[in-house]
Amino acid sequence: MDLTDLTSTDTEPASPAPPPGLVAGVDTHQDTHTLAVLTAQGAVIATSSFPADQQGYNDLTAHLDRLGPLMAVGVEGTSSYGAGLTRTLRQAGYDTVEVLRPSRRVRRHHGKPDPIDTIAAARTVLSGDGVSQAKDTTGPAEQLRLLLAARTRLISAATAITNSIHSLLTTAPEPLRERYRRLDTPALITRLARTRPTRTITTPQQAATSALHHMARTHQDLHHRAERLNQQMHHILTTHYPGLLAVYGAGTTVATQLAVTAGGNPGRIHNETAFAHLCATAPIPASSGKTTRHRLNPGGDRRANAALHRIALVRLRHDPTTKNYANRRTQEGKTTKEIIRCLKRAIAREVYRALTQPPPTDTTSTLAAHRKRHHLTQTDVAHALNTYPARISDIENHRRPLPQLTHRYHQYLTTLDTQ
């Protein structure tokens, strides 16, 4: 559709100048962004469209500068098509907020041309209903988002290849099926990657061997690349989000997802209840008659909810305190699903504190240096704490959250300091 201005915006506003307290709304698309500027009373001052590139962002910002002081700019899709514009507006000093898409009622009555969506976005900013502080996409959280997105695609591709290998083996010649029948998936991938298929294909068995070999090698390459991304994410987490890694049950990918959900400015989330709603763990009353029950919010970020779910499962398996809690709640008549829901709500509270409150300075990142000052090896510490050297390595490198052992490790080194 050919976008045209409803009001001329190519020249300076005619006198008298528009009153102060303007708001703006932007409807973002892949190729163009449409802007609308409204007065505090809701009257439309101007609408215009700009290319969705850096020059267009600069032109849009300059256009806003000419119109006068703005209370806020509402942008649809600040984490998708509007990400670049949001960064430019923030750098220019504009209060930029995320605007939810127009309601279906608005679109049913007024249609869906871009100026209508843009004006609706600006009026949403005026009402204050359906807006939130936009995520900061210029810091470590954005770095983690990009790395996590790539890793997720690599793992998905590796899973698809695994399924294809099993499917091909199902119809492969019997000698191949018999050779690999009893191998689990990791051993199967390793064996297939080590095979040496012939250069010339003359039989179905040779063709199957070659196909399986190349898929297995690709599977290994995908996992190696995913592991390199994992190491990069871990380094960013260690530097900027050590509190998340200290959460019991939060590995690198889980901690990364929670950091991405919160964004680079977690302070935009007003409190831990709002964070629980964001992660879809806030209980919603679902009582009926004499039964008092709660259910979870079906909305929110499902990937963050899945991350909290994984933490809950880890704690149910390995954390004595969580096991005791689960046993007590079971005796009270709670089901396993209800117990996990309660756990996820408590974990969301813990994660919010890890995101918004700085961790203590003496964390596991300093334990290795502390140990070396006493000229101790990881094996020496492991023997003293009656554990394995690998567990000490896990603690020092943030590979595995072990809070109880970490506390004992810290106490052991503190005792050595006093001797």
Model-flagged regions — what are they?
Residues 15-39, 121, 154, 257:
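Gly/Thr-rich phosphate-binding beta-strand-loop-beta motif of the actin/hexokinase/Hsp70
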Residues 147-243:
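Glycine-rich, often acidic, oxyanion-interacting loops/wings at catalytic, nucleic-acid
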Residues 90, 96-134, 146, 187-188, ...:
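Short alpha-helix plus adjacent loop in nuclease-associated cores
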Residues 31-55:
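Short glycine-rich, Thr/Ser-proximal phosphate-binding strand/loop in the N-terminal lobe
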